[in-house]
Every structure is written in C-alpha cells, then in structure tokens.
Amino acid sequence: TPTGPTGAARAGRAGGMRALALGRGALPPGQPCVEAVSGLFATALTRGGLTGGHRVTLVMPEDAPAMRQESLLRLGAQIIHTPAQAGLAGARALAKATAAEKGWYYMDWLNNDDNPTYHRRETGPALVRSTAREGSSIVDSIVIGVGSGGTITGVGETVKAWTKGARIGSAKP
C-alpha cells in the first residue's frame, strides 16, 4: 500500500487526495484546509498540508484523546472543538460551515470522490503489481477494513478489473 511520510496508508491517502484537489484547482496553492478528523488521517493531513503550504485546521469533539490533540498541535495543526455530545456529525457540520465562511478547502474525506479515486490510481494498482505472476494478478479474494469506504471502493474496483472473479470482502474495524 502506498504510504506517506508517517509510514501509514492514510498518509498516502491524505497526500494523494491533496494532490488530486490541487490538480483540478479545487485547492489553490496556499489555501487553508479544514477537516473533521483526529486520527492517523489528521496527522497525515497536517504534515502534508503544512509542508505543501496549506495551514490545516482540524475540527474534533472536545473529548478527543488529549495526547492525540497535543501531538497534532505540535505538528502545527490548529484545532477547533465541538461539544462531545455532538460527535463526529457535529464536527463535520462545523468543518463544512467553517470552510464556507472562511473560503477554506474542506477535504470531506468521508464523502470526497478523491478518496476512492486515490485508491483506484495508487493503492489498487500497487496491490495488483505486488501480486502479479506471469502478467496477471494472483489475488482471488481480499478483505478490506471499511471506514470511509474509499479503500474498498477503489481497491475493489481495481482488483476486480485485473482479476476476473475476485471476491471483495469487508471488515468493520
């Protein structure tokens, strides 16, 4: 799986989604980004965004783990809190509203087609190449953890295109 500077697959996805947005002009150079996220994707987005010249603001519930928040702040992220009871839905709503109000780019990784597009272009082909024997992939089935659905969509479509009859399974982490 393609990875980014943190070594995690989500780092590759964050960088890939940013590159796709830049490429189509949705994310102009220097435009700040906002996203509702606090995990590995947040770390990858912060690192990649800042090295690429995009200030990153993360919106998360106030009860997100303190160590994670401290780490993200040290990396250079700005954090906006929502009430804990608002959960991810509240954080996403505030991120979207903040982007609209300030003219920032809202990555919206859970609903953005750049997520599966990245996996169609990078992760899926990397998997097929790594399993290729005599010109064809030997993958007959694959199980993929499902969060946003981007990985299973992009990788699943790629594997099925290269390996007729391949079965794609999901696992909820």
Which residues does each PLM region occupy?
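PLP-dependent amino-acid enzyme catalytic core
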Residues: 1-173
